[in-house]
Amino acid sequence: RSLQIFGKKLPLFTGLPSALKELKEYVSTNPSFYTSHVTLDIYIISGGFEEVIRASKLSPFIDGIFGCTFAYESSSSQPIGIKSAISFTEKTRFLHGIRKGIDPLTLRTDPYRVNDAIAPHMQRIPFSRMIYIGDGPSDIPCLSPVVSGGGVGVGVSAPFGTFKKGYELAQGKRITVGPYTANYKKGSDMRKVLDEALLRMGLAIYIDRKKNVIT
């Protein structure tokens, strides 16, 4: 209960949660994207508590949340321990599950499903169609395959964050752009990058699907 109360009051970065709604509308109202069935799914893979995120104002615009969870006492519904913690290894597992189209519940209850062999053309969201936003070293194992797979890795830092984290992200071509200050408001550098990345990816999907229909 206290986690849910905290989640409802969770302070968010500038521009959130309205930016999530606007980005989804940006994709859904583009005629070319609509005719080629291009959609935007938004996932959160976080070392924070899942219940807090689910209770936050972000939740209505999120398609999947992967975070730390508690084990509860059955009679009192009180937390009695940590059920799952999210390390950089877990972040990578969930990322590959999203790529392969394995639903969040299955990834939780049957973790070995992430090892299923999926042909490239059967991947639900290939790395080349991902935009991964990371803010620290634990995101590097996820940023690297996304960027090397043709997707976009965006480095972000909190307004009160340190330069060190951004510097670590930028080493070894782990990110495509950034790091930017976590400002998602229209007109900000971060928002311009996201708008451009969505436009380019959407048009690439549109052209690819149109080509396949013609051939």
Show where each model-derived region lies.
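Short glycine/proline- and acidic residue-enriched helix-loop micro-motifs
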Residues: 1-7
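C-terminal cap/substrate-recognition subdomain and adjoining C-terminal extension
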Residues: 7-215
